[in-house]
Design a protein with these regions (language model features):
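Conserved hydrolase catalytic core segment
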Residues: 132-176
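Conserved HGGG/HGGXW glycine-rich cap/lid loop of the alpha/beta-hydrolase fold
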Residues: 53-105
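Helix-rich cap/lid subdomain of alpha/beta-hydrolase
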Residues: 171-222, 231-252
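Conserved serine/cysteine hydrolase catalytic core
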Residues: 213-285, 290
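Post-His helix in hydrolase/transferase enzymes
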Residues: 300-312
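Alpha/beta-hydrolase fold catalytic core
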Residues: 2-67, 91-93, 132, 315-317
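Active-site loop/oxyanion-hole signature of alpha/beta-hydrolase fold enzymes
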Residues: 97-138
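Catalytic histidine-centered segment of alpha/beta-hydrolase-like enzymes
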Residues: 291-303
Length: 317
């Protein structure tokens, strides 16, 4: 029996050694690749200092209205993710994409992810980039919560909200969130470069899968994906989302015009996703919605329709 236990112990140690060796090799490879990839990662917009950490704001176009794009949780490259849609709007309007801490070209920073802090950082970043309200907000997914809060707290700053399959507070009463252990494990895996061994993950990103980017932009997108996946800020947002959503829910529905583009809900772990969003928008004083037959990244799947409908809606404001 002792011999068996001893052999099991040796086997466990051997497996642990192999695992640690794999992690070390992965991390070394990741570090080298990050250094190489840094040569192509030049921010296309302006970098501003907010709460002692650099944030990236990309601005394109000009016009009477300023459209602010707000990325969903975990989107590694908001500027490229939204490109298919804002490039169809920037000939008529000014477009701004704010990349939160831990996203895109913005630095990962030890900052709270409560909704008040995130909103003030977004507003400050826009101000420092030379932009002034009012804005038309284009939030995707989780940023729907921040957009609604913005309209609740500063209604004079918001002309309208055009939601890209946006989350509303009620969905987080049902939405299954990953555990602390799972967030820590996936975050560690991303930081040591294990994601590089699974290229299908980045290849399945909507902007790439829908072929919305040039070959050079795809290269930049991949580099940002490997650098900014499951960052500390992204994981902290997930940790705080139920509290943030509850805070927005308490304040009711803001009185601003809204237009929701709603996905088929099949990529989301909430059975009644579509109904949640439809019920919400039907309670809005000036509210419209469009049911789409595609996945969660609606702006990559159907940018032509969304751009056309958004222009009509904005011109009626």
């Amino acid at each position: 029996m002792k011999i068996v236990l001893r052999r099991m112990g040796y086997g466990s140690l051997a497996l642990l050694g192999i695992l640690l060796l794999f992690i070390a090799i992965s991390f070394a490879n990741h570090t080298i690749k990050l250094k190489i990839e840094s040569a192509i990662l030049s921010p296309p917009g302006v970098m501003v200092d907010v709460n002692n950490h650099p944030m990236h704001v990309y601005i394109e176009g000009s016009g009477e209205h300023t459209l602010v794009f707000m990325s969903g949780g975990g989107t590694s490259s908001p500027v490229l993710d939204f490109k298919a849609l804002y490039s169809r709007l920037s000939d008529q309007y000014k477009v701004a994409v704010v990349e939160k801490a831990g996203y895109g070209f913005s630095a990962t920073a030890k900052v709270p992810r409560d909704i008040d802090t995130m909103l003030e950082e977004t507003r400050t970043a826009l101000t420092l980039a030379g932009e002034t309200p009012p804005y038309v907000l284009f939030p995707h997914s989780m940023s729907g919560i921040e957009a609604l809060y913005w309209a609740q707290m500063y209604p004079n700053e918001i002309e309208a909200i055009i939601g890209l399959d946006p989350a509303i507070p009620q969905v987080y009463e049902e939405y299954p969130l990953p555990s602390f252990g799972m967030r820590s494990l996936t975050g560690l895996g991303a930081r040591v470069g294990i994601t590089r061994f699974f290229p299908d993950i980045v290849n399945s990103s909507a902007a790439i899968e829908e072929k919305r980017l040039s070959s050079q932009e795809e290269e930049i997108y991949r580099a940002l994906f490997y650098k900014k996946t499951q960052t500390l800020n992204m994981n902290e947002e997930v940790k705080m989302i139920r509290n943030n959503a509850a805070q927005v829910l308490e304040r009711g529905i803001p009185d601003v015009p809204m237009y929701f583009f709603i996905s088929n809900g099949e990529e989301l772990p909430v059975e009644d996703w579509k109904n949640y969003l439809v019920n919400y928008i039907e309670s809005v004083k000036i509210g419209r919605y469009h049911l789409l037959h595609n996945g969660h990244y609606v702006h990559d799947a159907d940018p032509d329709l969304i751009a056309e409908e958004s222009i009509k809606f904005i011109e009626e404001l």
